[in-house]
Amino acid sequence: MSIDFQQLPHAGIRSLIPYVPGKSIEELAKEKGITDIIKLASNENPLGCSPLALSVIQTMSSHYIATYPSPWNHPLMSKLASYLKVKPEQLFLSNGSDYLFNILLNCFALHTDRHILTHDYAFSTYAIQANSLQIPINSVPIGHNWEVNITDIVNACNQQTGIIFIANPNNPTGVLIQQEEIKYLLEQIPKSTLLVLDEAYYEFAASQLTVNSLDWLEEHPNLVVTRTFSKIYGMAGLRLGYAIANPSIINILKRVQLPFIVNQVALAAAYAAIDDDDFIQSSLKMNNEGMLQLQAGFNELNIKYLPSSCNFLTFDCEEDSMALYNYLLDNGIIVRPLHAYKMNNFIRVTIGTKEQNSRFLTALKNFYL
C-alpha cells in the first residue's frame, strides 16, 4: 500500500503557501536564454557588499573556514554591541532574520492559548512561520493610505497575544510608522506580550526617525528589535541577522538555538563591514538619488506609488501586474509582483543604480506608451 506523505504533516503545514523569493538571475537566464539581466526584485544592494567585508573574505585562510564558528565568542559580538550602544548580552546572532522570527515563535507563542498579532500587508514570513507551527494569527486592517493604525493593534491585543510583529518600515509597502506611535504601542500592550520590531530597512529610514528604538529596551523589556546585514551592508548571500533584546529573552533564545547557526564567513565579513562608513554613505546617496529618479519616472507616466522609506518603491499598475511583470522579464528585468500579498495590481521594484533605473523606466514607458 502506498503512503500519501502529503497527509502526514499537521494541518498548518498541509495548508501552507510557502514563501517564494524573487526570481533569480540564473533562473531567468535558463528560462529565457538571455544574459543581460538586472535584478530589481529582492531589495539587495546594487553596489554589492562592503569592500572591507569583501577584502576580509578574499584573504580568509582555509583553516578559518574549516573550523566551526563560535559566534558568542567572536569579536563581532563586542564590536556590534559597541556600535549599537548596547551590551553583548543583549545580542543574538542568527542565520538571517527569518530564523529569528521562527525561534521567537517557538519560545514565546507556541502555547495552546497564545496567538500572534500583525497587520494586513505585513511581511509574509510572519504568517508562514506561525502557520507552520499552528499558531493562530490575528491581523488588523490598514488605512486607506497604507498606514498602520496603532490604535487598532492596541485594541486587538490581549493577554493571549504572545507576539506582535511589526516591520518598520514595512515590507512590501515601504511605509514608515513614526516612533511616537511605536512607543505608544509599547506603553499599552501587556508586559507579557513581545513586540518584535523588524527593522531590516532601518538604515534607510534612520534619518526620518526622531528616536532610536534601542533606547526603549531598558524601559520596555518586552521589546525585541531585529536588524540585518543583508540590506545596507550588501551581505544577503551570507545570511546574518541579529536581535537586540532584554538579556533574559536572549538567554531563552540561546537555549533552543541550532548549533553553529552563523557561519564563519558571515562573522568575519560583518566585523569588517561595521567600519565601512564610506560604503554605507555611498549606498544611502545612491538610494536617495535613485528614489527621486524612479519617482520622477512614475510621475511622468502618471503611475501611482506608495510612500517608501526603504530601498524600493511599490507602484500601482491599475490592473493585474502579471502582464507588465512578464514583459519586463522578456526584457531582462526582474521585479516583484505582489500577488502573494493579495496586492495583485502592484509591483515592488528595488532602487538600483542610475543605469539600472533608466533601463527599467525605459521598459516601463515602452509598455505603457
Curated annotation (Swiss-Prot):
Q: Which Pfam families does the record cross-reference, listed alphabetically?
A: Aminotran_1_2
UniProt KW Transferase keyword: yes
Keywords of this entry: Amino-acid biosynthesis, Aminotransferase, Histidine biosynthesis, Pyridoxal phosphate, Transferase
Family membership noted in the UniProt record: Belongs to the class-II pyridoxal-phosphate-dependent aminotransferase family. Histidinol-phosphate aminotransferase subfamily.
Annotated NCBIfam families = hisC
PANTHER family in alphabetical order: HISTIDINOL-PHOSPHATE AMINOTRANSFERASE, HISTIDINOL-PHOSPHATE AMINOTRANSFERASE 2
* Family matches, as HAMAP family: HisC_aminotrans_2
- The protein, known as: Histidinol-phosphate aminotransferase 2
